[in-house]
């Protein structure tokens, strides 16, 4: 069974600069869908400039991009979907019912939608009652399994089952877990066995071993969404889509070279579009929060990247890093998000 891979939406990380660079250097048709970081509809019924820049088809040429929307207002979802379809050519929209951010959840958005399943049901009912949505838009959902407990997850699955979702992407954690604690694989198993929609696995696939362990537990799952794992180790895609992921032999020297190419493409693009060098460097350091974990022999070089504030200093530190550091394939990675 061939595995299908999606790239997860990650705010500040998987914007169009990263998506395009990744597809050129590593993806090469291996990523079935790239999901945009969420669009948050506002009452003006207009997209922000940065949202337009990210969804613009000229910035997503040659890749299959799915726009993610975060709202708990069906009317806002519908006008956003209509505009995405009419003006930008998107026919698949993903609802964010998974973001654990406190500012999001306090507004009953993201994973906060799971707090009141009846309101989630009301939202989806209104969305699918709309003629335009039914006729033109494929709607998928990215969900968690609950807010503080998973006791309502069967009810949540029952609600999702009432509607013709394109697919259900399950991150098997509670909102209160954020991105820590063990995955709730029992809840994911429940989704696999009870969902009427196609179920996609999302969560903690950072290494080959992570992937093989999940695949062994859920052999019927053939579609996986990866985010942090592809930021940290872009070459992991070659392993997962291979005919035999367990025995696939990687060329880590080549992968390190390609990582440098990816980094440089993203950095150059961000320098071009962002207001000021400092902003672009800060964004790149967010990537290093993950990339640093797959290298050995590089503590001093990583420290120099952290300290750099100017473009010349940053580029010099990065060049030295890639000359010295050794790319390794680890069994487990525990991200601390500190850089």
Listing of model-derived features with the role each one plays in the protein:
Residues 1-339:
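Flavin-dependent oxidoreductase catalytic cores
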